[in-house]
A protein has these predicted regions:
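Primarily recognizes the serine-hydrolase "nucleophile elbow" in alpha/beta-hydrolase
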Residues: 1-44
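Mobile cap/lid helix-loop segments that gate and shape the active-site cleft of serine hydrolases
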Residues: 7-8, 39-76
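Acidic beta-to-alpha connecting loop that harbors the catalytic carboxylate
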Residues: 34, 90-92, 122-124
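Short beta-strand/loop motif that positions the catalytic acidic residue
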Residues: 80, 85-88, 92
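Conserved alpha/beta-hydrolase "acid-adjacent" motif
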Residues: 93-102
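Catalytic histidine neighborhood in serine/cysteine hydrolases
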Residues: 108-126
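Catalytic histidine-centered segment of alpha/beta-hydrolase-like enzymes
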Residues: 123-136
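Catalytic active-site module of serine/aspartate enzymes centered on a nucleophile-bearing elbow/loop
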Residues: 133-159
Length: 159
């Protein structure tokens, strides 16, 4: 969801009743995200779309295809995207790591802001929930350093 928020800033489709509000974000840090809600190709994709149809959108993709496109960060990459730090566990069995790689590549192809991608070795989905683990600790530290860099860069530009 953080990717979708970052890539739909000021999009009136997603802010009914407050279309004039600034909904931009300074940076995005998606972790093990699902960036493509449309493609049925690849490991776990058909099951994911079935899950979306039954529990999330509650509408069939064949009848409401645009809804799925609109909810897919992969189809919303844009030149003015904020800086991104994309993290994905290399051993994620719920969302294959390839999806993170493809999203990072697509975003790098168009964005003028930095796009950082990190694959966490031997990490499963939700690897960051194990707060006592070294993997979670170092990942949190890397996120903090990235966000501090974004903030410092923004301050320098403002001066």
């Amino acid at each position: 969801l953080s990717s979708l928020v970052a890539l739909t800033a000021d999009d009136p489709q997603f802010q009914p009743g407050f279309e004039d509000a600034d909904t931009s974000v300074v940076a995005a840090v998606p972790i093990y995200g699902r960036y493509d809600w449309v493609s049925a190709r690849g490991s776990g994709r058909k099951e994911f779309i079935s899950f979306l149809q039954k529990f999330v959108t509650k509408t069939p993709i064949v009848q409401h295809h645009q809804l799925y496109v609109d909810a897919s960060p992969l189809y919303r990459v844009r030149a003015d995207a904020p800086p991104f730090f994309i993290l994905h566990g290399r051993d994620d069995s719920i969302i294959p790591v390839q999806e993170g790689r493809e999203f990072a590549d697509a975003l790098r192809d168009v964005s003028t802001a930095p796009v950082v991608y990190a694959e966490i070795p031997h990490a499963q989905h939700a690897f960051d929930f194990y707060y006592g683990s070294p993997r979670a600790h170092y990942t949190a530290q890397a996120v903090e350093e990235f966000l501090s860099w974004v903030a410092a860069t923004a301050r320098r530009r403002a001066d």
